[in-house]
Every structure is written in structure tokens, then in C-alpha cells.
Amino acid sequence: LTNKRKDEKTISYAECHDQALVGDKTLIFRLMDKEMYTSMNKDSKNLIVDRGMALHKMIRLATIATAGDGYLNFMGNEFGHPEWIDFPREGNGWSYKYARRQWSLSEPDYLRYKYLMDFDRDMVHLFKEEDLLAFPPEPILADEAKKVLIFKRKNCIFALNFNPSASFTDYSFKAPEGEWELIFDSDDENYDGFSRLKNGERHWSDGKMNLYLPCRCAFVLKKIH
């Protein structure tokens, strides 16, 4: 994520142009595959889709939060567009069928695409509002065994638990002293999460902080005092 030269400006992205074209799969389609065609209704109960939603949000937050100088979305990955792009050509009979992006999918409340779009909008707004890309990420912890990644950027701490099944209570790590407030959470119900954390909850650090880290969840704490 941070393997870049400090003297060269770079743009980070979770998926590239080629993944969206016919012959490959978008990030979200790799995570959910055919389940996207039947289980993107918000009321549907599908563990594969739940997993895909959680990881898609986490991957995008991890990407922008470690970016060098900018973050790039590409043609619908903001809301997890389900299909590929295929421009008219001889091989498809000069068809326009897949030469599109269905932005309307991100509008209805009953489809999960809306919650991915809302997450992306608020995530990008956070980075603009706090001017976070103007400051480099500072590693705090990378726990390979538990699949936990924690780092700091400007006045914010980013905590990501990629563990598929284990949530951690009172997870302890070194952190700058002060009072910290939860300002962004991938597990928020507004982003089709399970709201295992409380919006605005506060934590204190005396040089060490203890946090509850739900599985497949990423969140941001901002120092307020």
C-alpha cells in the first residue's frame, strides 16, 4: 500500500481500468460473483454478499488512507457496479449492451449499491475536510496473526480488522495521548453494516489505547483533545 518513492507523486486505486472491461472481473464481482444477481436487495440474507460488502468498503478505505497524493475511482466502483464494460466491436456484433454504467442502481434505498455509494461519498468528503492526504501515513501496528492494521495520518487513527471471524475486545496498542472520537465506521448501518460500534463514541489514550475491533470492520478516530 505504501510501496512508493517519496519524491514521486502517485495515485492510489482499489481497481484498475482493465478489471472493469470484458474478460476480467471488477473487485466487487470477484468478492460476490453470481450472488450479485440475486442478493443485492437490502432485505436479502446472504453471507457471501455480507462478506463482499464489508471487504469492498475496507479495501477502499485502506487504499485511500495509505494513498500518496490522490485517490482514483473508476467507472462505477464507487457503488460496486455488477457488470463489465464492453465497447462496440466486431467480436460482440457491434453491440452497445454493455457499453454503459447503470448509475441508477445507486439510487434506490432497497438496493445495497446505494450504501456503497454513500460510503464512498462520505469517505472522500472526510479526506477532503480533514486534508488528510497532505500528511503521510504513520504505521502503528501490523498484526499478521490477527489480521489487524492500525496507523495514524495527521490527527486521525485508522483501525482495520480484516479477520473473517474474530472480533477483539480491549485490543491494546500504542497511541498518542489524548481524547479520540469515532468519526467514520465501515460497519455503520448507514453503509449497510451491523453498527457494532456507536457513532461518536470516545476513547482516551495515555500513550496506550484499548479498542473493540469488530471483525471485517474499519473505522477512523479523530483526536479532539
Give residue ranges: language-model regions.
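Solvent-exposed beta-hairpin/edge-strand motifs
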Residues: 174-190
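Acidic Ser/Thr/Pro-rich low-complexity disordered segments
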Residues: 189-197
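C-terminal beta-strand-rich structural cap/linker in extracellular carbohydrate-active enzymes
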Residues: 156, 197-225
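A structural signal for well-ordered alpha-helical segments within the folded catalytic domains
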Residues: 8, 15, 53-57, 114-121, ...
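Active-site rim elements
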Residues: 42-52, 104-114, 205-210
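Short glycine/proline- and charge-enriched loop/turn segments
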Residues: 92-105, 199-201
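Aromatic- and carboxylate-lined catalytic core of secreted/periplasmic carbohydrate-active enzymes
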Residues: 101-140
